[in-house]
Regions:
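Active-site HxH/HxHxD metal-binding segment of metal-dependent hydrolases
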Residues: 30, 53-55, 63-164, 191, ...
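Short capping segments at the starts of secondary-structure elements
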Residues: 272-280
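Short, structured coil segments at secondary-structure junctions
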Residues: 14, 94-95, 237
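Metallo-beta-lactamase
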Residues: 43, 49-51, 143-154, 169-267
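Short beta-strand or tight-loop elements
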Residues: 17-19, 58, 153, 159-161, ...
């Protein structure tokens, strides 16, 4: 993970009735952002991983605005990566609350066998055996940071759905690429965009290898999906973007252009290498 200086202007104000704070992780990416939409239904977006410091921070931040865990009325998971959702099952259980997540994230959210199937796919890519050993070790370690999610609490979200959360209607945008069912939330009335990890000010999001559960292909075309999803953000022009990592920012079109150029340039480099070496 390469963290760099922000590529766009930052903003130091948040939309009304919104709490934002960082939750620690043991990963190189550093802390993850958690957002609480304070109007009813009180909604926590990305409650972090099942990690002692994370839980303590989450409880303390809620307490700072006079809320307890049981005051939470809804949980949103932007995508099923451990740093964002590991605590979601615990929080929903404690609060007796539903969990909203993109429909294509459910295989990862509810069944960790998906990760082992992905490992078997990655083995076919010709990666050296010594490097392959990293994957099962990581997948095994990840389990300690994930609370089992009760499937009956999960509400699958599709693109274009309107979700009434935090006292306002939010438009669901399924923006695949970094994750198959990555969920971004757009609020046109306040010109606010919760972008998850789809667009970040100080990290270039990486389209990840994902199993394809919806077609005969072994894997999803993550880079193509990511670039297509980026194009949707260009037309929004929000006043403030609340990302999964890093500070809130503006100038979405500028960041979209920079991010797109980065990925296309890297793709050109890889193509040139394949043509030069004859690698399959």
């Amino acid at each position: 993970i390469a963290v760099h200086e922000p590529l766009v202007p930052l903003v130091d104000h948040l939309p009304e009735a919104t709490l934002a704070f960082e939750l620690p992780t043991p990963f190189p990416v550093g802390p993850v952002n958690c957002y609480v939409l304070l109007d009813s239904p009180v909604t926590v977006v990305d409650p972090g991983m099942l990690f002692g410091q994370t839980l303590a921070t989450l409880v303390a931040e809620l307490g700072g605005v006079g809320l307890g865990v049981r005051d939470v009325e809804a949980v949103v998971v932007t995508h099923a990566h451990p740093d964002h959702y590991g605590t979601a099952g615990w929080l929903a259980e404690q609060a007796d609350a539903p969990i909203y997540a993109g429909r294509a994230e459910l295989p990862k959210l509810l069944d960790t066998r998906d990760r082992h199937q992905l490992y078997e796919l990655i083995r076919t890519f010709g990666i050296p055996e010594d490097m392959l050993g990293v994957f099962p070790a990581f997948y095994g370690a990840v389990q300690q940071w994930l609370h089992v999610i009760d499937e009956s609490r999960v509400i699958p979200v599709d693109d274009g759905d309107t979700l009434w959360l935090g006292g306002r209607p939010l438009e669901a945008m399924v923006t695949p690429g970094h994750a198959a069912g990555h969920l971004s939330l757009w609020e046109p009335t306040s010109s606010r965009l919760l972008s998850g990890d789809h667009l970040l000010p100080s990290i270039t999001p990486n389209p990840l290898v994902e199993l394809d559960h919806e077609s005969d292909l072994l894997r999803r075309r993550s880079l193509v999906e990511y670039l297509d999803s980026l194009a949707r953000f260009e037309t929004l022009n929000p006043d403030v973007v609340l990302p999964g990592h890093g500070p809130a920012f503006t100038s979405v079109a500028q960041l979209v252009a920079t991010t797109r150029l980065h990925h296309l340039s890297r793709a050109d480099e890889i193509l040139a290498h394949i043509q030069r070496t004859g690698a399959p």
